């Protein structure tokens, strides 16, 4: 609730100052390397995924801007066969795919480092909603007390699957370089919400993106 109020406050301030801001748009695509952190995240491995989205940037001056974006993002984690834990108990390789719509709202600080080249530092909250995904098991396994036998795929979200929590929220920190209209960035996201009820881990992600500013 606090996170939602903070984002609404930021968006309200944005609307009030739009008349004094320079507005631009961008598209971005890239690679995620996601896993879990926190409770029972031992032995979780990075899983690659894609990320694609659009953003708007409200530039208040040459240094400071606000950038809300909307991404379709593939996250999750992998576990190797033979792992025995409180959440994951696997005699098989496990790959958990979580597909999200993400809304990050970043404050950006821009520093000119060369002709037509800027260093950009960004930070801010994000909200995410799980919209799909499958968990794949190459053998017998148990996730959160749900048992799967043999080679199978089940839904990551929903009562008929792993029953992962759809809602996620967290904090984003990024570093990028602007070469004119070309954007290259590296960021990390740390989730505040557990992926499922109980003693479950949180989402963690490292992202690499390439974008273009209009």
Where would I find each of the regions flagged by the language model?
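Short glycine/proline- and aromatic-enriched beta-strand/turn motifs that initiate or cap beta-hairpins
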Residues: 22-53
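Extracellular/periplasm-exposed beta-strand and loop segments of Gram-negative cell-envelope proteins
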Residues: 36-45, 75-100, 130-168, 172
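Residues on the lipid-exposed face of transmembrane beta-strands in outer-membrane beta-barrel proteins
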Residues: 27-31, 50-58, 70-72, 101-109, ...
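Predominantly the C-terminal beta-signal and adjacent terminal strand-loop region
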Residues: 71-81, 93, 158-162, 168-214
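Residues that define the transmembrane beta-barrel architecture of outer-membrane proteins
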Residues: 44-50, 97-103, 117, 167-171, ...
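Bacterial Sec-dependent N-terminal signal peptides
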Residues: 1-28, 210-214
